[in-house]
Amino acid sequence: MSRAEFSYDFPHRHLLSVADLNPVDIQIIFERAAHHLATNRTPDKRSDVLRGLTVLNLFFEASTRTQGSFEMAGKRLGADVVNFAVAHSSASKGESLSDTARTLAAMKPDIMVVRHSATGAPQFLADHTGLAVVNAGDGMHEHPTQALLDSFTLSQHWGSVGGRRILIVGDILHSRVARSNIGLLNILGAEIRLCAPPTLLPSDVDQWGCDVFHDLDEALKGCDAVMALRQQRERMSGGFVPSEREFFHLFGLTHERLEVASPDVLVMHPGPMNRGVEIHTKLADDPERSVILEQVESGVAVRMAILELIGANIRKEASA
């Protein structure tokens, strides 16, 4: 698709939180993502929608799927994509986020994709750089593009997630993926269940509008989809579970456990995946149940949609 052919009314310059989106915004993203998903399965994957724009990937935390997905998304849309190596930057020498932001903004990129360990870092950059900012994960706060690709993946199977019963199991406490998914699924009208040991649930979880379980077999009953989350040991300062073996015994997903779920239950994982801890390897690789690789494929398409829509707004501003 060329720039001249693209026209969608998406009223956002940034994507910082799923709370900024309404059902119409989400539908627009999903429509564009479906287009890109189909195009990405053909030999001719590229367009010039973002030609002349620069996307800066600024990842202060390690990433494989998300950074690679954003890089591929930008390049397939014709953008110039720059991956900023934070480990070799002045930020690693003690430079403040504010100074890093001003320095990068002076280079005149158009869209900044940011992952940072500090909650609110993408919002800070949006407020202080004048650039369009996409949140690729900030601390334990949010990961909006992951939530969008997760619901998009499910919508490809069901048409809509509204009214579906979806379980998230694992380390809810430290998970920005869980927080963004809960926010988005609530907007879309899904029934959300959470399952974890008490030590891996936030103290205010009773205010999240979800049904909370500590027994996985009870939580799985009648579920249409279940998402396993890894233990985020890099954010843990103590022992939250006795051992990985005990965690798998109580909360690990297996084929046997899924027998109480919906007959067509789908299994998800945002990655990185610890086989034999939160999910059995046979279940993770089961093409009848697992949509984990579909999530990865959807990630490129959804991020293409987001960059495309934000890029269109940047061009509108420039021509106004």
Curated annotation (Swiss-Prot):
Pathway where this protein functions: Pyrimidine metabolism; UMP biosynthesis via de novo pathway; (S)-dihydroorotate from bicarbonate: step 2/3
Keyword Lipid biosynthesis attached: no
GO cellular component term of the entry, any: cytosol
InterPro entries the record matches: Asp/Orn_carbamoyltranf_P-bd, Asp/Orn_carbamoylTrfase, Asp/Orn_carbamoylTrfase_sf, Asp_carbamoyltransf, Asp_carbamoyltransf_Asp/Orn-bd
A GO molecular-function descriptor: aspartate carbamoyltransferase activity
Pfam annotation, one family: OTCace
Keywords on record: Pyrimidine biosynthesis, Transferase
A GO BP annotation: amino acid metabolic process
Broad EC category: transferase
Catalytic reaction(s) noted: carbamoyl phosphate + L-aspartate = N-carbamoyl-L-aspartate + phosphate + H(+)
Residues the record lists as binding L-aspartate: K93, R176, R230
Binding site for carbamoyl phosphate: R65, T66, R115, H143, Q146, G271, P272
Record EC number: 2.1.3.2
Sequence similarity: Belongs to the aspartate/ornithine carbamoyltransferase superfamily. ATCase family.
UniProt cross-references to NCBIfam families, sorted A to Z: asp_carb_tr (TIGR00670), PRK00856.1 (NF002032)
Self-association state and partner proteins as the record states: Heterododecamer (2C3:3R2) of six catalytic PyrB chains organized as two trimers (C3), and six regulatory PyrI chains organized as three dimers (R2).
Function: Catalyzes the condensation of carbamoyl phosphate and aspartate to form carbamoyl aspartate and inorganic phosphate, the committed step in the de novo pyrimidine nucleotide biosynthesis pathway.
Name this protein carries in UniProt: Aspartate carbamoyltransferase catalytic subunit
Native organism: Maricaulis maris (strain MCS10) (Caulobacter maris)
